[in-house]
A protein has these predicted regions:
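N-terminal assembly/interaction segments in proteins that build large macromolecular machines
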Residues: 2-198
Length: 198
């Protein structure tokens, strides 16, 4: 039986329900760190199930940075207006705006990158590798690796999270899905910077 103090501590750290905290502590013999990991795995598994669900509610959130020199707007969607009004959802929208202001991504995910941009990037990489005397299959592997790096620079969901670079932006969205119990999607975003060329 999990001790109430441990349940309270785990609940404060994770925001999980009492029954989930109790289950996690019993499954990990009262080890708080393992219980947190247990809940994250369970939450992410639940989040994966919610990913395909339709999102028609949400908010438009804006953020102004550096004394008005950088501005970001995002449309963040969820399944119900109840979740859209929660502080956790609004905080996620703000975190995503901060990330966009900081990293200037061009696309939400790799699926949004136009094929002609991918081909252009491959051409640039091939040009950089043309003097290497490597077999074509090795060159293709190098191109794949460099394309992965490209996606990590230009796709919001693949960027390292600004508050914890061991995690990606997609991870904080999955955490929010697990916590709020609804699918969450980024519909679109735009970043403005004073003096920026279009």
């Amino acid at each position: 039986m999990a001790n109430m103090e441990l349940i309270k501590e785990l609940r404060e750290k994770t925001g999980a329900s009492i029954s989930y905290c109790k289950e996690a502590l019993e499954a990990t013999q009262g080890d708080i760190e393992k219980a947190i990991e247990y809940l994250r795995k369970k939450g992410l598994a639940q989040a994966e199930k919610k990913v395909g669900r339709e999102t028609r509610q949400g908010i438009i959130h804006s953020y102004i940075h550096l004394g008005g020199r950088i501005g970001v707007m995002i449309e963040l969607n969820c399944e119900t207006d109840f979740v859209a009004r929660t502080e956790d959802f609004k905080k996620l929208a703000n975190e995503l705006c901060l990330q966009i202001a900081f990293d200037s991504p061009k696309y939400i995910s790799r699926d949004d990158v136009p094929q002609e941009i991918i081909e252009k990037e491959k051409e640039i990489i091939r040009e950089q590798l043309k003097d290497m005397n490597k077999p074509p299959q090795v060159i293709e592997k190098i191109i794949e690796g460099k394309l992965e790096d490209f996606y990590k620079r230009v796709c919001l969901l693949e960027l390292p999270y600004i508050r914890d670079d061991k995690r990606k932006v997609i991870d904080i969205i999955k955490d929010a899905i697990a916590k709020l119990g609804e699918n969450i999607t980024i519909k679109r975003f735009i970043r403005f910077e004073v003096g920026e060329k279009e």
